[in-house]
Structure formats: C-alpha cells, structure tokens
Amino acid sequence: MSAARTEAALWVAQRVTALLLAGFVLVHLATMIYAVRGGLSAQAMLARTHASAAWPAFYALFVLAAAIHGAIGLRTVAAEWLGWRGRGANATVAALGLALAALGLRAVWAVTV
C-alpha cells in the first residue's frame, strides 16, 4: 500500500472511530445516569453486566474503538509536534495501541465475567 493510501485509510479510520466513540459515550453516560437515578449501586450494576452478553460486547467494541482512535491520534501528534515519522514511530504507536487495547479488554473482562 502506498504512503498516500495508508494516510487516507488512517484518516478514514480516525473519523469512523470518532463517530463510534460518540455513540458509545452517549450510551454509556445515559446508562450510568439512568442506573444511578434508579438507585442502583455499583454492585448492582456489575451484577447486571455479568448477566448479559450484550454489555461485554458493547464495552469491548468501545475499548477497541478508543484504542484505535488513540493510537492514530498519537501517531499524528508525534509526526506534527515532534517530527517523528517512519517505521519506528509507527511501530511504537502500534505497540501503544495494542497495549491500550489489551489493558482495556482486560478491564472489560474483569467487570463482566
């Protein structure tokens, strides 16, 4: 894939993940507000996440979108502010994105399984 195509694909991925994150944040906030106003404790909320297959899937997708979005954003910041480009920068940012995804998925697993 050419450099121009790679940049275009990353640009699209950044915008798509931003759109997904907006939806995920709205659902998360609405759910938390509804649960707290309904008098649910943290323990009761966790019990409900354990009983559903939808919540782990929702939060796993949320984490993956955030990790991808964050990694692409860090790559852009490194290039624009630090002048750090090339394979080394790409590999470092990819490793950070994978680490963020792994930590986030571990957190999802911890509260839903």
Model features per residue range: what roles?
Residues M1-V113:
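Membrane-embedded alpha-helical bundles that constitute the cytochrome b-like, heme-associated redox core
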